[in-house]
Regions:
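Walker A/P-loop
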Residues: 206-228
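Mg2+/Mn2+-dependent nuclease catalytic core
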Residues: 61-155
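Signature of the SF2 helicase/ATPase Hel1-core->accessory helical subdomain module
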Residues: 225, 231, 252, 329-346, ...
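Conserved pre-motif I regulatory segment
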Residues: 172-214
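A substrate-engagement module of RecA-like helicase motors
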Residues: 178, 184, 237-347, 352-355, ...
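Conserved RecA-like P-loop NTPase helicase motor core
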Residues: 571-582, 632-742
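A contiguous, basic/glycine-rich beta-loop/short-helix subdomain that forms a polymer-engagement track
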Residues: 322-347, 357-365, 455-574, 582-583, ...
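Metal-dependent nuclease catalytic cores that hydrolyze phosphodiester bonds in DNA/RNA
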Residues: 1-82, 107
Length: 758
């Protein structure tokens, strides 16, 4: 939204206008390999490079229709031929292109055509759809010559179809900003430390900068960041706010906090959308995403306008409400959510919706030139999540399985991969080795395989079985990250025994410093606030996350006193691997004695499932009268919920869990639901060849290899787990840190300052 001469105008991109008004038919996601974004850019560059010197590229155009301001860049215009071109890249036989795609492309060309005629006072113009096949680089042209008055009528019809929506959006935005400016904090007063956090968030939003905020567990960080950021939206002319969480509980807390802001009138003026993974939203997982298979894909774009209108009217669109709206209009809930990401004010979702290489929210913000603010919940998780997002892996065992069943057309390209792979494995003497760069011969073989699969799919769009399609996606990701390879990543090969005495190799492009990728996402937002109870040391997170130089770091004062939490260091126990067997009986005695002194609910954390099980067996034998329950491998949501439901006020028992797992952070067990924790580990990552390579890279980049690789990540998990105990100023509890290394001065300095260690 903008103002011109005191009049409010709704700005819309040509592409967004046409996608709103000109899409029709079924949702059709039958897999065909579209060109990548980089291939699309290269294709546009190639086509325009073939044009004469007077050819004009990226022609900026805009026009008005009542309250609409329509803007965009036409791909190219030849003034001597009076020909405007809309360029699209594709693969394979163009005859296989769905008709609704061509219809949309013509709509874009005609809108650009009118904007050009209006600006240059042309009576007519030749419009050309130019399709470039990225494999053979051949152009196919579809041409029509259209009078300006015809184009004007088409432009006005598209705008008219969008106008009622735009006027509704203008009214919503004005009301939203007016009511957000008057938004009141939902509680009678701020908690201790919460006002300090809220003021810092508001200042960062107003200044348009990033903020790192370390705030103790239990002060209400979620509402303490959401409230000031919402208040800042009108003054900063923000279009969207993204609340990003690492795990499902973080999303749930955000939605709960937003509900509290509705007040007695239920009048929170923002449209809230919860984004969930496709597999959790799909109504027909046994069907393919196209109209011939799934009833919710058939006629999707015909039914979308009514579903979209009902959804924005509802405003509150968590997973349950969105599903209700979607099914009422017989459209797919997941893809309705994807569409509504364009029209919500506040999206709540996983990190990957903004930070992943192909992230949807980031892409929408860029295409629509939104001014956005980003809140990153439990931001200490972004280091490891970022590393995973920007890494890629290829497993030779999976590849051999794919090769056995692949179509004949792929036999030779896959053989080339196998030969290159085997050569790598033969030259490597050790089971694990890191290299300075990815192997060029293998990368070339992968590129050839991608081209061959593309050719196959261009002729047979449904030719890939699931395993081959998954491998195709894997080599695409591997190739993309190989192009971006730098000192932020490692390339390593790990060998393991296979059949017949042969070894199999796993190749990994392993990102270890996500800063280079994340920095661009921070730069794309007006303001980003990263908050967590464990966001220190400051330099560690600033270095690995790529925050702008000078990003302020806030440590919020703890509202809790040392009298609330007894912290005991058990100096006579070592949980090092070599001493684990000897540690089991002393650990059982510590747990049993604490439970005898003060019966209640406790959590006991261990470094692995094996260690947990050994400790549990010894404890049960020594204290059979103490109720116990334990975390198990690969628990589903129902099992995790059942584990937590054992922690009831007035209850007694000890839950055994793995440090860094589902119960070490992001759970809220206030009051008597949890009165203590035992942490029998420093949480240090395992010393292995991979982590040792990471340590060497951290040392060369930051001069602090051991701490960056082992100590800081480990103690972050310890502090998070201990933070489950004290959730309010009325709580009282105890934490036992079971390992002699907790007494080391270097380790003690990294523990919360308000703890009084005993």
């Amino acid at each position: 939204m903008t103002e011109q001469g005191g009049e409010a105008l709704y700005q819309v991109a040509v592409r967004a206008l046409c996608e709103f008004s000109a899409k029709r038919g079924d949702l059709d996601l039958r897999f065909t390999p579209s060109p990548s974004a980089l291939e699309g850019i290269a294709g546009h560059t190639l086509v325009t490079s073939r044009r004469p010197a007077h050819y004009q590229r990226e022609v900026a155009l805009d026009g008005r229709y009542r309250h609409l301001q329509v803007r965009g860049r036409a791909d190219g215009y030849d003034p001597q031929a009076n020909c405007l071109e809309e360029i699209k890249t594709h693969r394979g036989d163009l005859a296989l292109q769905p008709a609704n795609h061509r219809h949309l492309h013509w709509a874009q060309a005609r809108v650009y055509g009118w904007l050009l005629c209006a600006e240059r006072k042309l009576e007519e113009v030749e419009l050309a759809l130019v399709y470039l096949e990225v494999g053979n680089q051949k152009e196919t042209r579809f041409v029509e010559r259209v009078r300006a008055d015809e184009l004007r009528l088409f432009f006005e019809s598209q705008c008219q179809a969008f106008l009622a929506w735009a006027e509704q959006e203008l009214a919503h935005r004005q009301r939203r900003d007016r009511e957000l400016a008057a938004l009141r904090f939902p509680h009678a007063e701020f908690r201790h430390g919460q006002r300090q956090l809220a003021e810092a968030v508001y200042k960062a939003a107003s200044a348009g900068c990033c903020l790192m905020a370390q705030a103790p567990t239990g002060i209400g960080k979620t509402i303490g960041t959401l409230f000031p950021q919402l208040k800042a939206m009108p003054g900063q002319r923000l279009d969207r706010l993204f609340f990003l969480a690492a795990k499902t509980p973080g999303r749930a807390l955000a939605l709960h906090a937003l509900r509290s802001l509705e007040g007695e009138t239920g009048g929170l003026p923002v449209r809230v959308l919860e984004l969930v993974a496709r597999d959790k939203a799909c109504e027909h997982p046994d069907k393919a995403c196209h109209g011939e298979s799934c009833p919710l894909a058939q006629g999707f774009y015909e039914r979308l306008p009514a579903a979209r209108a009902a959804a924005v009217e509802a405003r509150w669109l968590d997973q349950a409400r969105l599903r209700e709206v979607a099914l009422a209009h017989r459209v797919c809930p997941y893809y309705l959510g994807q569409e509504l990401a364009r029209w919500c004010d506040l999206a709540v979702g996983d990190y990957n919706y903004y930070f992943d290489l192909g992230a949807m929210l980031h892409g929408l913000a860029q295409v629509n030139q939104w001014r956005v603010a980003v809140l990153v919940d439990e931001a200490h998780n972004l280091v490891e999540r970022g590393r995973r997002m920007y890494s890629a892996e290829l497993d030779q065992g999976d590849f051999l399985g794919v090769r056995k069943t692949a179509p004949e057309a792929l036999r030779k390209p896959l053989e080339r991969i196998q030969r290159a792979w085997n050569e790598l494995a033969k030259t490597q003497a050790d089971d694990y080795q890191a290299y300075d760069e990815p192997p060029q011969k293998l990368l070339l073989a992968l590129q050839n395989a991608v081209a061959a699969i593309n050719d196959l799919l261009a002729e047979q769009p449904q030719a890939l079985e699931p395993a081959l399609q998954e491998f195709y996606f894997a080599i695409l990701q591997f190739g993309r990250l190989a192009e971006l390879f730098g000192e932020h990543s490692l390339f390593d090969i790990e060998k393991r025994p296979g059949r017949n005495g042969r070894s199999l190799a796993r190749l990994c492009l392993r990102n270890v410093v996500p800063a280079a990728f994340l920095a661009e996402r921070f730069a794309a937002s007006r303001s980003t606030v990263l908050f967590s109870a464990t966001l220190g040391p400051r330099d560690y997170y600033a270095d690995l996350l790529g925050l702008p130089a000078g990003t302020p770091w806030l440590e919020v004062d703890s509202p809790f006193s040392s009298e609330q939490l007894e912290v005991h260091i058990q100096r006579r126990v070592s949980t090092r691997y070599a001493q684990r067997q000897a540690s089991l009986a002393p650990i059982a005695a510590i747990l049993g004695e604490q439970f005898r002194q003060r019966p209640g609910n406790y959590l006991a954390f261990f470094s692995s499932f094996d260690y947990l099980q050994q400790a549990l067996d010894v404890f049960r034998q020594a204290y059979p009268w103490v109720p116990c329950w334990s975390q198990t491998r690969r628990m589903d949501e129902a099992e995790r919920r059942a584990f937590l439901e054992r922690f009831v006020a007035g209850g007694e028992g000890i839950g055994f869990a793995v440090l860094g797992g589902a119960f070490g952070e992001g759970i809220d067990l206030p009051g008597e639901r949890l009165i203590g924790a035992f942490i029998a580990t420093l949480g240090l990552p395992q010393v292995n060849p991979v982590n040792e390579q990471i340590r060497l890279r951290m040392q060369s980049l930051f001069g602090d290899g051991y701490d960056y690789t082992y100590l800081y990540p480990g103690l972050q998990k310890v502090v998070q787990a201990a933070g489950r105990v004290i959730r309010s100023r009325s709580d009282r509890g105890v934490v036992h840190l079971i390992d002699d290394r907790f007494a080391q001065a270097k380790v003690r300095r990294l523990l919360p300052g308000w703890w009084q260690l005993r």
